[in-house]
């Protein structure tokens, strides 16, 4: 699942990888995540359960935010982490997430809250690497963040108010 981390005024790509394994149940975040990102464990678990979806509590869950050397802060990774868990557990089709980038903080009930830097994310995807023709990724963001990201003319931005709004599309 793809997202972006803010580094000064840049929005650098981040890949959220999720692995579910048998063993002692746990939920581990790796990849230079700060305290606020590590708190995502409880927000994501509650949001998935309160949305009526199944949280794989009997599994060992490992979430990697790559690249590891890029600092990650804020709750912006809640939505991509939740989607990664839902895809890894077979509740949504992970293949349908290709071509999208996600960001959003989840409330315990599954509502999406705006995140900082959505304009930077939108600008970053609107400028593909020099000489590389490509299809621009589409952004899925909370309502307030989506309005800001939509200021970039070539950006394709989708708004969501709740985790279920996103899940129903994939």
Summary of predicted features, one role per range:
Residues 1-170:
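Peripheral, non-AAA+ core regions of ATP-driven protein-machinery
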């Amino acid at each position: 699942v793809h997202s972006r981390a803010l580094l000064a005024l840049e929005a650098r790509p981040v890949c959220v990888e999720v692995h579910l394994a048998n063993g002692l149940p746990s939920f581990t975040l790796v990849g230079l995540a700060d305290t606020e990102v590590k708190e995502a464990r409880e927000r994501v678990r509650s949001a998935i359960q309160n949305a009526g979806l199944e949280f794989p509590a009997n599994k060992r869950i490992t979430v990697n935010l790559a690249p590891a050397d890029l600092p990650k802060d804020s709750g912006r990774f809640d939505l991509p982490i939740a989607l990664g868990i839902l895809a890894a557990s077979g509740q949504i089709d992970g293949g349908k997430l290709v071509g999208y980038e996600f960001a959003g903080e989840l409330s315990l009930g599954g509502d999406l809250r705006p995140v900082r830097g959505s304009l930077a994310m939108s600008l970053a995807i609107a400028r593909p690497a020099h000489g590389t023709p490509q299809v621009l990724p589409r952004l899925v963001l909370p309502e307030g963040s989506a309005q800001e990201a939509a200021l970039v003319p070539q950006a394709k931005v989708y708004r969501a108010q709740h985790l279920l709004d996103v899940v129903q599309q994939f």
